[in-house]
Amino acid sequence: MRLWICLSMIGWTKMSNVFRIMDYLDFLIPNPKCELLYNKDYEFLIAVMLSAQTTDKRVNLVTKDLFCKYDSLDKLRKASLDDVMGFVRPLGNYMKKAKAILLISNILYDDYNGIVPNDREALEGLPMVGRKTANVVLGELFGVSAIGVDTHILRVSKRLGLVSSSNPLVVERVLDDVIPKDKWIRVHHQLVLFGRYYCKAKNPCCDCCKLKDICFK
C-alpha cells in the first residue's frame, strides 16, 4: 500500500531516482551526523532552536561560550536576559532567542525535572520550537525516525525533482513516503550536509555532481 502511495505522488521514474539519490548520498556522505556541538540534551535543544536563520558554525561559536559560563540548566535559567542577549547577539533575532533560552530552561527545570521530553507535542509547546526543531531533536536525542525539513532539504528536494511545493510540511510528508522509515534520520543528515557543502544556494558544485542529469536547477 505504501509503495502505491509513493508512486501516485511522484511516479515510477521519480521513485527510481529516490534510490539513486540515496545511493549517491551514501557514497558522498557515508558517515553523516549533526554538526551542532553539545554535551547535554538541553544544550542540543537550545542549539537547534538558535540555528534558525543562521549557520551551525555560528551557533557553535555562541553556545560554546554560553554553556561554558552557564554550565548547568539551573544556572542558565537564572541568567539575566541582558547577559544572554549579549551571547546570542551575533545570531540575529537575538532578543527573541535570548528570551526563548530562558523560558525553555525554566520550563524544562520546572515541568520536566530538567529533562528534554521525548514527546513531539511537549517539544512543540516550547518557545520558538516548531515541527522542524522537534523532528531534529527527536531524531538526534531519542532515535525517533523523523525528517526535519530545513532550507537545505527544501532546496535539494526541489532541485532533484522530489517535490514542487515550498511548504515544509508537504515536503516532509513526501519524503516520509518515498524514503524507508529506518533511513529517515540518516537521509535527513545527508540532505542537510549535501545542501550545505555541495548543492549550495549559491555556486553549487554542479560540475562534479553525479545527479546533475536529474537536477532542475
Regions found by a protein language model. Give the residues of each.
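Catalytic cores of DNA base-excision repair glycosylases
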Residues: 11, 16-217
